[in-house]
Amino acid sequence: MQAMYGFGGGVALTACFSRLDIRIVMTEFPAAHFRRHRFPAEIITHAVWLYFRFPLSLRDVEDLLAERGINVSFQTVSEWAAKFGLKFANQLRRRSRGQFADKWQLDEMVVTIKGKKYWLWRAVDANGYVLDALLQSRRNKAAALRLMRKLLKGQGIAPRVMLTDKLRSYSAAKADLMPKVEHRSHKGLNNQAENSHLAVRRRERRMMRFKSARQCQRFVSTHGQIANLFLLHRKDLTAADHRQLRTHAISTWREIALSIDA
């Protein structure tokens, strides 16, 4: 992930959001503001980061900010997440384009929104990084084709191997778009993709389900890219290496977030 996101040095801003963190942010970096926003960009970007990085509700984020003397309503946090979340995610997506593993895992899960059933189609690479996610009303070949076209456009390259469950829509769509790609279809082969759905389930519980298909799509599109940045595979790292990579990830997040022309 270092090469993928162009990590550089920077000041760490930890998840605990301590007083020391805020002092570091305000003293080490020049104050920046987004147009037509009275709060500093550092506070807005941190609120957005908290909301998408952790399974927190909007009111949870409001309380975390209030505990540090920053009085922001949960409605304002919601507006920030809606306005800036996808902008940040798109910057991350552009940086990582075409740099994922060449083995892709695809999966779909059901999401119920206002009593209507939707299917959330998701693709991850062999290392668990989210390639893309697409909410659709169907679970058929046409839906699989839309996901694969989105993946090919986003990555700019086809995978070497594609792993799925036994849903026939995958093989039919692959035959049309990527006939030369090896396709392995078996229950359990796409565990990485299945596990990647857990974040959506956790958010569903916090929100008492998504309120609209648009809200769900916006969340999964943003969350996946931010989760990628902080997916550091801790079990394979020494404590020192993990701290260094986390610092680099936070530095990259700040660099991207504060470069947005809002």
Give the role of each language-model region.
Residues 55, 114-130:
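Short conserved beta-strand segments at catalytic cores or DNA/RNA-binding microdomains
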Residues 1-114, 146-262:
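Charged, often Cys/His-bearing segments associated with DNA-binding zinc-finger transcription factors
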